[in-house]
Amino acid sequence: MELLGDTYFMCGDLREQHLREGPLSTWWLTPPGIDVDSFSARLGTTYDLMSHTFGAPAHPYRVFLRAHPHRGANASAHPASFVMAMNPSRPLDVGSLYETLAHELVHEWLHLDGSDHEKTWFVEGSADYYSLVLPLRAGMLDQAAFLAAVNVAARECYANPRRGLSIQQAQRLFFSDFLAHRLPYVRGMFYLADLDARLRRETAQKVRVDDLVRGVVRDRSAGEQIGISGWCTRVENTLHSPEMPHLDDLVITGAGRPSEDAFGSQFEMEMVDVPVPDFGFDSSTLVTGHVRGLVPAGAADRAGLHDREDIELPRYPEIVRMNVGDVLDIKVSRGGDSATISIPLTGATALVPQWRTRQHTTD
């Protein structure tokens, strides 16, 4: 029944609406509004790269693209496939699209066993982590794009209005609160980056987090159940010190911060005071563009927004990139007239790690 629930059917004339790139194939009915040839070629290369990194043989893998009328895109992974919905008239930029799709590819291999709050940080965090670091290592992603994605993730993590939630609390809100939903992803990503740095330091660069991940993939494919305690044991066998305090600090409570060399010595880190994006309305407004949960005397209320209004605002990653003193411009239509309401980012702030390329390094 689980396999049946994960099965996706696409019906229609697909004879001319697909491309194959090695074991990976891409299928669509409505033209998706992107260059499918270059998209499929890059995704096929990424599939081969991940298959090799995780020590798992390549096998047929299908990507289904479908149209929807909404902003942005969403995707879900299934056995040997994933489905992505996008708006052909408003497609994502190439970088955001590739990052989303590379994330979904990782789900084909990397899993832990256990309850949701014990494994989601690994499943989603490893997908965020490897969708960035593997293309960077392979030269498929330049340092500027890599750092832009990492620094947005850091802001989503450490300036998140829900940052005080434990991972168990965040998991309970996983499908109802957009901001809480992001915490397992980004905390897991920065934990794995920090762990990779600790492994490299303690083993004179001989062991990476990749080596532990390959062991998990191998042993789970042989039928072994590996949960959070099994993961910690594998780390401890290499580092010879308790791992749970690190996991608690960076994932369970989120109180800790990754080390400066989490992504390698070619980057340096600084702590930056950035805005906490809490505008005084329900977080779903950032996704739907429909104002809900307006807080009396909150920033949006003071700026003149009304509950249940439809608004147009930048995509959330663009909002997260904003700095203290910037102004968020929101377009709203009232009675056939269009107006712009501005919310200055002068509220709460948080110190967040941000990375940049280190000058004069040979690493």
Feature map (PLM): residue ranges:
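Juxtacatalytic substrate-recognition/specificity segment
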Residues: 15-119
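Beta/coil-rich, acidic/histidine-enriched accessory regions frequently appended to metallopeptidases
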Residues: 219-363
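Pan-zinc metallopeptidase signature
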Residues: 165-253
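Surface-exposed patches in mature extracellular/periplasmic domains of secreted proteins
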Residues: 56-64, 115-119, 138-147, 205-212, ...
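Acidic/His/Gly-enriched intrinsically disordered linker/tail segments
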Residues: 116-189, 202
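Long, well-ordered core segments of solenoidal/helical folds
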Residues: 105-106, 110, 150-162, 212-222, ...
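Soluble non-cytosolic domains of exported or imported proteins
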Residues: 33-45, 91-96, 100, 117-121, ...
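Propeptide (latency) domains of metzincin metalloproteases
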Residues: 1-17
